[in-house]
Amino acid sequence: MKVISNNDLEIHKLPGLLHKTLSNKHNGGQEFEVWKQIIEGQSSTPVHKHDCDETIVVLRGEGECLCDDRRFQFSADQTLIFPANSVHQIINTGQEELEILATLSMSPVIVKTQDGERIPLPWDADKSLGE
């Protein structure tokens, strides 16, 4: 059992996006990862896929997601469930920030382009809380 202060976790800044890894293999989450992300208004994640399921809880904001060439609208208090290897993207269609909590069913998570090329993530080597 471990209690972590989310305020002590490193924030990774990407264009249009703030990322914080709440749980992963480096701090006790052996079989899954939990990410908190804030996507700026009119910004998005890259189109990507991974070899695991992903469940996203929308905490605030609204937007749309693309999943395997289909488009879905969503807003706060909704949950998005992506099967493993589905090509997807989260888009903030509003002006306000979109805040999401993502749980991914593997650790570490390997993120790939839709063509299967690995996307290096700045938090891949995040061991700030030690093992």
Language model: regions and residue ranges:
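Short beta-strand His + acidic residue motifs that chelate non-heme Fe in jelly-roll/DSBH
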Residues: 47, 65-66, 82, 88-95, ...
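Short acidic-glycine-tyrosine-enriched beta hairpin
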Residues: 70-84
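A generic "binding-loop/recognition-motif" signal
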Residues: 51-52, 70, 86-87, 96, ...
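A short, N-terminal "cap"/entry segment at the start of jelly-roll beta-barrel domains
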Residues: 1-31, 115-131
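Glycine- and acidic-residue-biased ligand/ion/polar-headgroup-sensing regions
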Residues: 53-54, 58-63
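Conserved short histidine dyad/triad with adjacent acidic residue
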Residues: 19-20, 35-50
